[in-house]
Swiss-Prot record:
UniProt name for this protein: B-cell receptor CD22
Pfam family, one: Ig_3
GO molecular function: carbohydrate binding; CD4 receptor binding; coreceptor activity; protein phosphatase binding; sialic acid binding
Gene that encodes it: Cd22
Effect of Y828F: Abolishes binding to GRB2
Domain Ig-like C2-type: 153-250, 257-347, 352-435, 440-521, 526-603, 614-697
Amino acid sequence: MRVHYLWLLLILGHVASARYSSANDWTVDHPQTLFAWEGACIRIPCKYKTPLPKARLDNILLFQNYEFDKATKKFTGTVLYNATKTEKDPESELYLSKQGRVTFLGNRIDNCTLKIHPIRANDSGNLGLRMTAGTERWMEPIHLNVSEKPFQPYIQMPSEIRESQSVTLTCGLNFSCFGYDILLKWFLEDSEITSITSSVTSITSSVTSSIKNVYTESKLTFQPKWTDHGKSVKCQVQHSSKVLSERTVRLDVKYTPKLEIKVNPTEVEKNNSVTMTCRVNSSNPKLRTVAVSWFKDGRPLEDQELEQEQQMSKLILHSVTKDMRGKYRCQASNDIGPGESEEVELTVHYAPEPSRVHIYPSPAEEGQSVELICESLASPSATNYTWYHNRKPIPGDTQEKLRIPKVSPWHAGNYSCLAENRLGHGKIDQEAKLDVHYAPKAVTTVIQSFTPILEGDSVTLVCRYNSSNPDVTSYRWNPQGSGSVLKPGVLRIQKVTWDSMPVSCAACNHKCSWALPVILNVHYAPRDVKVLKVSPASEIRAGQRVLLQCDFAESNPAEVRFFWKKNGSLVQEGRYLSFGSVSPEDSGNYNCMVNNSIGETLSQAWNLQVLYAPRRLRVSISPGDHVMEGKKATLSCESDANPPISQYTWFDSSGQDLHSSGQKLRLEPLEVQHTGSYRCKGTNGIGTGESPPSTLTVYYSPETIGKRVALGLGFCLTICILAIWGMKIQKKWKQNRSQQGLQENSSGQSFFVRNKKARRTPLSEGPQSQGCYNPAMDDTVSYAILRFPESDTHNTGDAGTPATQAPPPNNSDSVTYSVIQKRPMGDYENVNPSCPEDESIHYSELVQFGAGKRPQAKEDVDYVTLKH
């Protein structure tokens, strides 16, 4: 309990000390005095800082004519504004912005700016701004100066204003309030200055509203003239185009003395007198003493008669000479500096002085424009001039300048002039020489060689000219490097070519003049001989008409003859070579030859290519037309065609397409079946040609022959064995025959039929086929069964109906017929048999045992042929 009491005492002591020190810790900044007038507004810029860094305003009051009540220890007075933080939004930064005429523009942190609108005259005096932040409180006095009428602006001027020096005037008003705008305008002698002119440099306006000052300013920067001295400058305050107040000041412009000079008379004849006066018209500050200085052509005058009077000075010139002509001015000084008068020119009249001539340009180039000027001092100026060329008058030219538009060599010479005015004429002082430069004249190139000039000869040329100013210093030749220079102006050309270009020379001083080109006229044999095809326009085909022309580019002399050669042999003479119907045999290399009296020239060979369809086709067989089977054979289709054959087609002896499009047909490996005739067909862009047939014979190899011989021997051995067995069977048959004769009622019979088969005649050899017929290819075994009809008792229905036909009781009631045809031995397809064909054996057997009636049935015959 005691500890808590000690802590409470410490907290109360801290609060008390904070209250006691709060008066020293508040900081409030605002303008010391604010100015306004009845009906305007006042904006009070204000910044504050509470004793506690994070403290915020809880309450703000604005009192008018406030007092402190010592009894209640509170401030009393008219409350113009009272705002307290709201319970709904205690953290808000702004209070209620406006109460009556007062608007709070600050916040709860550091801004206490206020605005009173409209302001009243009775608002003058002190306002009290009461601010509370927690336990901290503060009363800040604010002084207002409100007048019933708008007060005048102030104008700040520099201490001294000088003419032509830039100065700045400042018009200010200790007033600025947003929502009540004012304008500051400048006037010079009641004329508003609205824009930048030659004398007005700038007009700037600014508004300042800070915690230190509140004012509106306008600055006028200009360069005053001396005539602006004493003029009024006015600054006017306006609101909504209404003049509120104004202030006027007078300009005190300091300037140098302003002088006026007069000459009487300004034009005087030689030896007369002249009086000049200089008057001081104005000066600020004024001249202490009149001390006037005189100047002629910018130089001070000395030892002249002067008369000084108040504010005036006189200069008297006696017995005026021409040297006294010129420009005069006077000068006087004050504390600012010297002032000068304008210049006046004194003219002294006299007769022309001796003249001289100036030539422009000199020396002159031929063709240039030349101007000659006659220089003769005179006053008044000379009105008439007489020009002389080589001391002879030039009629028609009476001006000061003599102009020659295009000078030529004959214009060269000495020139002089004579000037004249109303006081008399002058004299000729000295002559001027006109020197006209021109390039060499009449330049020519001369050939100093024998003519005619032949190709390969040497030629000498000389460059000559008529006149030149200045003299010729060098020569040039065109084309450059065409020869060697023997000496200046002489050129030697070694081995002149047939196409030598024309040669010209130039003689040069500071300019070059070229001679006309001289043609060497070199004689030479015909050049660039060539063969031209006149017709046809496109490719040449057999049967067309062809016309060739012999052409050449150059020939000197021009008379020529033409000759034609084919493959080096002379064909005919003439410019044209014609083929009525060209053939392949006309193909070859053609040259045309052109000759003149100098020599002959042969053209390059021109190849005449005649296009024609394939011809002379034939089939060549490699390695030969008789080839053993198993090897390979290559058939080539040889032809004559232009252009070459692009597609080949091969056919066999039967005319069948072998589907080979190449020039060569390869057969590998060869078989006997490849034997036959072959032909080829070739096609190019012109047409198609076909070869006659060529025969290829393929014979058996020894291996094949051996195999077939062995097969034949085996077959013969088989026949012999069968023959032996046949004899045995025959013998057996003869034995059984006697027994069969005893059986009369027997219907069975057995017999052999021998049938000799005629051998097919071998085919004759031909180019398409070789060999003979081979019976072994037709080996057959024939077999037949003859069934006997059944007895009549069983023939109750259709014999062909399977339902009523009963099978025979046994297989003995049948007839068997067979043919055995033996395979021939040693028979080959392409070898004739060495012995006749063995005959075939036919065997049949008819057997029927038992007695009784035959069953009546439809006789059936089954016949079977077996081939192997």
